């Protein structure tokens, strides 16, 4: 089953290759640019690409637009694919913003300031855009932004809640990019890394009206007991609200979601069927603590093995979404590694199953692993490697535990980013 899981992963990642997703929606002929169902005859065409898939997305845009492209800016994570000319490329930090992220925001604002009536701005957004583009308000600064970002990531807040905060301490997020691009027409192609594929959440809503408010930000701080830096508190008290639905800035805006979690999950399910497993695409909306998500999957596996409900083996349970980790210890890991380790512990000694959990960008948390691949024998292998799995969970040290059990998954930078992918294969009845 481990080999089957690796084949399923390869197929799922190929389905979300960013160049393919852009190419399906963008083309040009003569002076006309076609995006989805819309057609434009712009004076000039510029591209702003930001996110962990920005390199291949920009490359695909260059191929589609040809000489129609007037210029562009591409913001990438270090080690990721760079775009061709005429793009200016800036390498920025992720998951923590850095000086490159600040420089990228400055260059993006300069690009926006140069737009005129009759121009078309194509914005290519993928996961990671929020950190890669550090458009922090001038009264906050990078260091306090990094403190805020780190506190939110450690708190266990869901990505949508984190983005709610980011929008209100930024100059481009929360729809402000579109406001600054006026009077040009803005078309955004969005490779979604958020549950539900809502444009106002992708990249912290760079190109969408913001339905969240300053009061929502305060609720996030209270719910997760986050104490923001004083500069953030002062900024929020200044009532810096984002543009809302109905604002005139969005009259010349088109958002198109070109791919997301369902794309990879569906491809994984179909590949599983091809390999002889009846697939159940359970949900692409699973969020929350990785341990709780793992417990749900463990319960489903036990039910299938004991009662053949909701379907009999051989079968595949496929889910997507974005899990989080509440940091309690000082170890290494990420949500998918924590999911995999928790699942292995809960199903220890049970045969006839194998599971894969990965971050589709190839980097789970701040580690070099994409996630984990575990079976009923993984916990025993971890112990043989000298690591106590329960203690590793207490210390949030899933990386080293899975490493000890030879259960880490490495893909390298995949070039895409469409949330988490989890696949559990079940081959037959359990035996202890």
How would you describe each model-predicted region?
Residues 60-69, 86-89, 109, 136-147, ...:
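A glycine- and small-aliphatic-rich helix-loop capping segment at beta-alpha/alpha-beta transitions
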Residues 75-117, 160, 165-166:
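Glycine-rich oxoanion-binding loops at beta->alpha junctions
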Residues 166, 184-187, 209-300:
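Accessory alpha-helical/coil subdomains and C-terminal extensions
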Residues 52-53, 57-81:
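Active-site cofactor/substrate anionic-group-binding motifs, chiefly glycine-
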Residues 48-50, 73-76, 123-127, 188-194, ...:
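Short beta-strand segments
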Residues 138-230, 238:
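Internal gly/pro-rich beta-alpha loop/helix module
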Residues 1-46, 55-65, 98-117, 259-264, ...:
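N-terminal glycine-/serine-/threonine-rich phosphate-binding loop
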Residues 341-432:
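Internal helix-turn-beta structural module
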